[in-house]
A protein has these predicted regions:
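Membrane-embedded multi-pass helical conduit in multi-pass membrane proteins
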Residues: 27, 283-311
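Acidic donor-binding/catalytic loop of UDP-sugar-dependent glycosyltransferases
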Residues: 85, 134-150
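N-terminal membrane-anchoring/stem segments of glycan-assembly enzymes
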Residues: 1-40, 176-180, 185-189
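Short, acidic, metal-binding catalytic loop of nucleotide-sugar glycosyltransferases
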Residues: 62-72
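Long helical/loop segments within the catalytic core of UDP-sugar-dependent glycosyltransferases
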Residues: 23-26, 102-120, 150-217
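Cell-envelope/extracellular polymer assembly enzymes that use nucleotide-activated donors
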Residues: 42-45, 74
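Catalytic donor/gating beta->alpha subdomain of glycosyltransferases that bind UDP-sugars
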Residues: 151, 160-183, 213-216, 221-283
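Acidic helix N-cap motif at the loop->helix transition within catalytic regions
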Residues: 55-59, 84-93, 102, 142
């Protein structure tokens, strides 16, 4: 093995070890919600954008409506052109806390989800806290009260409780943990929480909790109207407007099965990662090469008998 190759393997192995150590530190510093939160003393509105979620929306709504200590809770379901009977499932829910809103088509320059979220937020005229939720998320009974408690106790403007990710196939079990691993290894959470730099941000749009005042100050979803990864973009907009926010441990608050098998994983990540890399082929190749070098090269070198691969 050439000396240059050995040095490359050593450097990549060292970076891999540093990333793992940083993930351990981040995991220890990750904010965790209280097990027994106090009641929320203000109006909370859950905005639930849906499109063809007939199989999910009833269970999602049931979990939202069963929240404990969530204050004056309201739910705005924004049906974004469903054709599978989603709206009818929502209309059948006999609870006056639920409002069904038929979304108007996105204006030019807007994507569907930001537009639906913006319409839901606009309908929540007296909300002091907004919760944006995906239909495939199942909340635990104290989820909203616990998330708001983190928001208040840490003096934050936005928190993104990362739900426990459920998997049902080998592809999901292999790929889904990489989302958390990326921000755990690369993003210094406590620095990101304090820093005004928008680039230091991680969020998960499955479950977002934001103060209405901070949301409006940031321009709401209008500020991220054309963003595929609108969750991270919204946190960046909040930070750019002077707010503070961070991802927090949501594994005890919510659960979500994001994709159903390899096809969903492939299509979903192809869309989101391509957008994250700016739609540039060179950036995609560079990112894949860099991540593969750091995380795959050292163990492969070790398997072929290289002591350098063992760092």
């Amino acid at each position: 093995m050439s000396r240059g190759w050995q040095w490359l393997v050593r450097i990549c192995a060292g970076l891999s070890v540093l990333g793992a150590l940083h993930a351990v530190v981040n995991t220890a510093l990750l904010r965790r919600p209280p097990a027994l939160p106090g009641p929320v003393g203000r109006r909370v509105t859950v905005v639930l954008p849906v499109r063809d979620e007939a199989d999910q929306v009833a269970d999602c709504l049931a979990a939202v409506l069963d929240q404990r200590g969530a204050g004056d809770l309201r739910v705005v379901v924004v049906d974004d052109g469903s054709t599978d009977g989603t709206a009818e499932r929502v209309a059948a829910v006999a609870d006056d806390r639920v409002t069904l809103l038929r979304a108007v088509p996105p204006p030019p320059g807007w994507l569907g989800k930001p537009s639906a979220c913006a319409q839901g937020a606009a309908a929540a005229t007296d909300a002091e806290v907004l919760v944006f939720l995906d239909a495939d998320v199942r909340l635990m009974p104290d989820a909203i009260a616990s998330a708001v408690a983190v928001l208040d106790d840490a003096g934050l403007d936005l928190v993104s409780p990362w739900p426990r990710q459920l998997t049902g196939s080998a592809a999901e079990r292999l790929v889904q943990p990489l989302q958390q691993w990326l921000w755990a290894t690369l993003l210094p959470l406590r620095l990101a929480e304090r820093s005004p730099r928008p680039s230091l941000a991680a969020a998960n749009g499955q479950f977002l909790v934001v103060r209405r005042s901070a949301y409006d100050r940031a321009g709401g979803h209008g500020a991220v109207r054309g963003q595929v990864i609108e969750d991270v973009a919204l946190l960046r907009a909040v930070k750019a407007a002077g707010g503070r926010g961070v991802v927090v441990d949501g594994s005890t608050l919510a659960a979500c099965r994001m994709y159903d098998g390899w096809t969903g994983v492939r299509d979903g990540y192809a869309k989101s990662l391509w957008s994250a890399l700016g739609g540039r082929p060179a950036a995609a190749v560079g990112a894949a090469a860099g991540l593969s070098a750091v995380w795959l090269l050292p163990p492969l070198a070790a398997l072929t008998g290289s002591r350098a691969g063992l760092a």
